[in-house]
């Protein structure tokens, strides 16, 4: 899979941009605040219908304009797919695939597979469980339509249950109904996550050993509020009932995959608590390259890899690993200088220079 071309109109600082990408390595070079990350962001948006930088779509629209437009021409499964995105100032968006308008975001997710590595991804190791849940949910949603459906339905039921918990007069019968529904959707979510963690461990083992020259072993462990993972549905219903009084007091649901997490261990030591920043960054690098392999295993094609200003933060060995591992993967790289890349680029690579919302090839 690879991107053939990208068009932007009134997107961030791009008034009108149309570029063709090569199926191999594409490097966007420029000083800070020139628009390099805006290109990455627009590509990412076509995969998930959301930015990785903001939840406010109107920020994507150029100043004093009414709308922004993205067109991504993608070659996937031996077919060309054109994704069109119109973003309006009122927060609405209109998306079409091959000129057919979609009615739900779920119809887009999985059409264009993408993995991104940016400096913010260090949060996957360092910060709250919500960051790690979001990572695993995004990865699984683009691979598994059923998972995305279960996640959407689970969150709807969770919202309704929490509304009941906030009422002065608690409707116990409604809570009974919501408990069963949560457990049904929650079981599917947890089972799929557990399988993903297995795959993550399978691929990460060799990747991390290679990056660290065999000095470290990495392992991921899923941490669930549901203790009996052999009987998730019944166990979850029971725990929701047992914790109902606490949930009523706190006005929030305490059991379920929305409270789960996964831990990252380096040589059996918790990377979040005891890992150095270098070790944490290497862990994220491992996760991202394992994600590439998982997507290849499931779909038969590598996704597009987006590397947003991360090479400058990697040491020589890690940088070399990245640049020697992307030969068969379309990669979009942003950076301020090309000096460290020249020996890894060839006649099949493409270099773009970004200057204040204008791109020269």
UniProtKB/Swiss-Prot annotation:
Matches recorded under CDD domains: ABC_RecF
Residues holding ATP: 30-37
GO molecular function: ATP binding; single-stranded DNA binding
Cellular location(s): Cytoplasm
GO CC annotations, alphabetized: cytoplasm
Keyword set includes DNA repair: yes
Pfam families per the UniProt record, alphabetical: SMC_N
Keywords annotated in UniProt: ATP-binding, Cytoplasm, DNA damage, DNA repair, DNA replication, DNA-binding, Nucleotide-binding, SOS response
GO BP field: DNA replication; DNA synthesis involved in DNA repair; double-strand break repair; SOS response
Function text: The RecF protein is involved in DNA metabolism; it is required for DNA replication and normal SOS inducibility. RecF binds preferentially to single-stranded, linear DNA. It also seems to bind ATP.
Entry's family note: Belongs to the RecF family.
Protein name: DNA replication and repair protein RecF
Lineage of origin: Bacteria, Bacillati, Bacillota, Clostridia, Eubacteriales
Gene behind the chain: recF
């Amino acid at each position: 899979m690879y991107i053939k071309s990208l068009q932007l109109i009134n997107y961030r600082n791009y008034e009108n941009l149309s570029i063709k990408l090569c199926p191999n390595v594409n490097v966007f070079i420029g000083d800070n605040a020139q628009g390099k990350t805006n290109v990455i962001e627009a590509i990412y948006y076509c995969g998930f219908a959301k930015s990785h930088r903001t939840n406010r779509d109107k920020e994507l629209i150029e100043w004093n304009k009414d709308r922004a437009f993205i067109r991504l021409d993608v070659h996937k499964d031996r077919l060309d797919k054109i994704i069109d995105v119109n973003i309006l100032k009122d927060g609405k968006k209109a998306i079409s695939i091959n000129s057919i308008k979609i009615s739900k975001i779920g119809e887009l997710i999985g059409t264009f597979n993408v993995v991104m590595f940016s400096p913010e991804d260090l949060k996957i190791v360092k910060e709250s469980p919500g960051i790690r849940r979001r990572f695993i949910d995004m990865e699984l949603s683009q691979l598994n339509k059923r998972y995305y459906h279960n996640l959407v339905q689970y969150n709807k039921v969770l919202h309704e249950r929490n509304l009941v918990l906030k009422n002065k007069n608690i409707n116990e019968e409604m809570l009974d109904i919501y408990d069963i529904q949560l457990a049904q959707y929650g079981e599917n979510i947890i089972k799929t996550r557990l399988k993903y963690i297995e795959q993550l461990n399978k691929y990460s083992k060799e990747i991390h050993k290679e990056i660290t020259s065999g000095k470290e072993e990495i392992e991921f462990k899923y941490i669930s509020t549901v203790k009996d993972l052999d009987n998730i549905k019944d166990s979850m219903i029971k725990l929701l009932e047992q914790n109902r009084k606490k949930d009523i007091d706190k006005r929030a649901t305490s059991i379920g995959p929305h409270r789960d997490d996964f831990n990252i261990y380096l040589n059996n030591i918790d990377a979040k608590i005891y890992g150095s920043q270098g070790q944490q960054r290497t862990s994220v690098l491992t996760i991202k390259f394992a994600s590439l392999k998982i997507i290849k295993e499931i779909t038969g094609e590598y996704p597009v890899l987006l590397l947003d200003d991360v090479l400058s933060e990697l040491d020589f060995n890690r940088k070399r690993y990245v640049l020697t591992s992307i030969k068969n993967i379309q990669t979009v790289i942003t950076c301020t200088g090309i000096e460290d890349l020249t020996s890894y680029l060839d006649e099949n690579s493409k270099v773009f220079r970004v200057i204040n919302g204008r791109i020269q090839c």
